[in-house]
Amino acid sequence: MDFNLNDEQELFVAGIRELMASENWEAYFAECDRDSVYPERFVKALADMGIDSLLLPEEHGGLDAGFVTLAAVWMELGRLGAPTYVLYQLPGGFNTFLREGTQEQIDKIMAFRGTGKQMWNSAITEPGAGSDVGSLKTTYTRRNGKIYLNGSKCFITSSAYTPYIVVMARDGASPDKPVYTEWFVDMSKPGIKVTKLEKLGLRMDSCCEITFDDVELDEKDMFGREGNGFNRVKEEFDHERFLVALTNYGTAMCAFEDAARYANQRVQFGEAIGRFQLIQEKFAHMAIKLNSMKNMLYEAAWKADNGTITSGDAAMCKYFCANAAFEVVDSAMQVLGGVGIAGNHRISRFWRDLRVDRVSGGSDEMQILTLGRAVLKQYR
């Protein structure tokens, strides 16, 4: 098995290193995190490199580079301190549109490609429907040749500034036998109210409550086929969970390297603290977790490129990497001591971000349930 990157992948990784060294991005990220602002300038710089085209098919102007290349790029971005969680819609979000969306919907999204601006996101979660997606109450109702959307969504990421969202709703005409359908919604339509929510981490990507009060839609705004909503979002969930896991690894690697440099420089009791056995033990455990994450993610990326990845694989990556990465960052923060918990060290941001990832994108508990079912299914 060859673990070396090919020439194309090496070029992408080298380009990432060059970009991250081109200016003091960390100061920019710290400012965006403090003010809960989307880092549009950074995302635009990545789009200029073609990162938004990595998984896009060649016939649509993309690179069709594959998931292994995506993994290599994502890991390097994270290792160098980039908030890759703001990029979840860039590499693969286009592809569900190309398959499910109408040409008009595709054109609207593609108009934002390469701009660095947020383009779209899905709106599924509701106050009474988190992990239990089937309990959602938002409805669409047909009246006088129009469709009217009513209800509310909560904890919807990337929704403060995005021009379009894809809303999951149930048919109001069939309450006893729910029909779940997605709708492509222009956020400028009357009847939409967006309330930005504060959160512990992942602060560069907005989190909002959205209410719909008789928002008027047309049949052409249907996204995909009627009644097919759950099938599409299942694939989107798997895709998101893999990207979250990649982000977790990169962030943990960055924290690990920050702590290692500090341990070799910080002197206490007359010598570098990295010479103390208890500190060495922390780094041994961190290294084991990082290596396990990396191997798991590259295997999943290879499976994705070969069409064999499953929901169980995505759940395993999401659960293991979210937890292992948090443990790595927590240990790295312990090594840094007061430096890590006071002032403006980026590790405090990493700690907050990774704690959120054990809930967002699918809770730890739901990943365990998904994985357990998938494992036992293999032996039926």
Curated annotation (Swiss-Prot):
Homotetramer. It comes from the Bacteria. Pathway: Amine and polyamine metabolism; carnitine metabolism. GO terms for cellular component: cytoplasm. The gene is caiA. GO terms for biological process: carnitine metabolic process. It holds the Pfam family Acyl-CoA_dh_N. Its cofactor is FAD. The keyword Flavoprotein applies. One of its GO terms (molecular function) is flavin adenine dinucleotide binding. This is Crotonobetainyl-CoA reductase. It is found in: Cytoplasm. It comes from Escherichia coli O8 (strain IAI1). Gene3D superfamilies: Acyl-CoA dehydrogenase/oxidase, N-terminal domain (1.10.540.10), Butyryl-CoA Dehydrogenase, subunit A, domain 2 (2.40.110.10), Butyryl-CoA Dehydrogenase, subunit A, domain 3 (1.20.140.10). It catalyses: 4-(trimethylamino)butanoyl-CoA + oxidized [electron-transfer flavoprotein] + H(+) = crotonobetainyl-CoA + reduced [electron-transfer flavoprotein]. Catalyzes the reduction of crotonobetainyl-CoA to gamma-butyrobetainyl-CoA. Keywords: Cytoplasm, FAD, Flavoprotein, Oxidoreductase. Its EC number is 1.3.8.13. Belongs to the acyl-CoA dehydrogenase family.
